Amino acid sequence: MQAALRAFFMLLFSLLSLLGIAANGFIVLVLGREWLRYGRLLPLDMILLSLGAFRFYLQLVGMGHNFYHSAHVVERSGVLTQQFFHLHWHFLNSVTFWFCSWLSVLFCVKIANITHPTFLWLKWRFPGWVPWLLLGSVLISFIIALLLFWVNYSAYQQFLIRTFSGNMTYEWNAMTEIYYFPFAQLVIWSIPCSVFLVSIXLLINSLRRHTWRMQHNSHSLQDPSTQAHTRALKFLISFLILYVLSFLSLIIDGTKFISMQNDFYWPWQIAVYLSVSVHPFILIFNNLKLQSVFWQLLLLARGFWVA
C-alpha cells in the first residue's frame, strides 16, 4: 500500500477511535454524574455506564497498541508488550460482549410482549440481578483472560531464548496464535453471543408482530405509537448488525490473518473497532436522558463559538 493511502487509513482509524472515545466518555460522565448525585442508577443506566467505561478503556488500549507497534514493528522486544496487550484485549472484549448481551436481555424483558410464565418471572426478577450480573461478567472475563495468558505463558516465555532455539519457538507461537486463540475465543464468546441473539430475536419478533397488528387495526404509519415501534425496530436491527460484525471481526482478527505488515492492516482495524465507535452514538440518540444532555452541550458549544 502506498504511504499516502496508509497514512489516510491511519488518520481515519484515529478519527473513528477518537469519536468513539468521546462518545463513550460522554456516556460515562453523564451517568457517572447522576450516580454521584443520587447514589443509585436504574438497571439500564448501570449497564450503559459500565459498557461505556469498558469501551472507553478498550479504545485507549487499542489505539495505544496499534500506534506503538506500528512504530516498533521491526523490533522483537515488542513481543512481550504484545502479550500484555492481548491480556487486556481479551478481558475488555469479553466484558463488553457480556454487557451488550445483558443490555439486550434487559430490553427484551422490559419491552417484549410475551406471556409465558418463565418470561414473566424473568421480567420481574432480572432488573434486580443487573448489578450482580455486571460484577460476575467482569470477574469471569478476568479469570478467563488470565487462564488464556497463563496457558500460553511458557510458549511466550521462549521468546527470551529464541536466539538459542532458532525458528522453532517462533513457529510454535505463530501456530498457537493462529489455531488455538481463535478457537478459544469462539468457544468463550459464543456464550454471551448466544444470549444476545436469543434475547434480541425474541424482542424483534415481538415488536414486529405488535407493529403488524397495529397497522392492520387501522393505525396509520404516521401514528406516533407505530412510529415509536418502527424506530425501536431500526435501533434493534442496527444493534444486532453491529454486534455480529464485532463478533466476526474479532474472531477473524484473532487468526492474525492480517498482520501489521499487511497492506490492509489499517482498513481492517477500522472494521474491528467500528462497532465500539459507532454504537455509543446509537445509544445516545435513542436514550432521552443522554440525548437531552448532548443537545444542551451542543447548544452551549454553538453559543460559545458564536460569541
From Swiss-Prot:
Superkingdom assignment? Eukaryota
Q: Which sequence ranges are marked TM in the entry?
A: 8-28, 41-61, 89-109, 130-150, 184-204, 235-255, 265-285
The Gene Ontology CC terms held by the record are: plasma membrane
Query: What GO terms are given for molecular function?
Result: bitter taste receptor activity; G protein-coupled receptor activity
**Annotated keywords:** G-protein coupled receptor, Glycoprotein, Membrane, Receptor, Sensory transduction, Taste, Transducer, Transmembrane, Transmembrane helix
The membrane topology of this protein is: Multi-pass membrane protein
What subcellular compartments does it reside in? Membrane
Where mainly located? membrane
Q: Where do glycans attach?
A: 152, 167
Give residue ranges on the Cytoplasmic side. Answer: 29-40, 110-129, 205-234, 286-307
Q: Which residues lie on this side of the membrane: Extracellular?
A: 1-7, 62-88, 151-183, 256-264
InterPro entries assigned: TAS2R
Q: Which Pfam families match?
A: TAS2R
Q: What else is known?
A: Most taste cells may be activated by a limited number of bitter compounds; individual taste cells can discriminate among bitter stimuli.
What family classification does the UniProt entry report for this protein?
A: Belongs to the G-protein coupled receptor T2R family.
* Function according to Swiss-Prot or TrEMBL: Receptor that may play a role in the perception of bitterness and is gustducin-linked. May play a role in sensing the chemical composition of the gastrointestinal content. The activity of this receptor may stimulate alpha gustducin, mediate PLC-beta-2 activation and lead to the gating of TRPM5.
The protein's name is: Taste receptor type 2 member 41
Gene name, Swiss-Prot/TrEMBL: TAS2R41
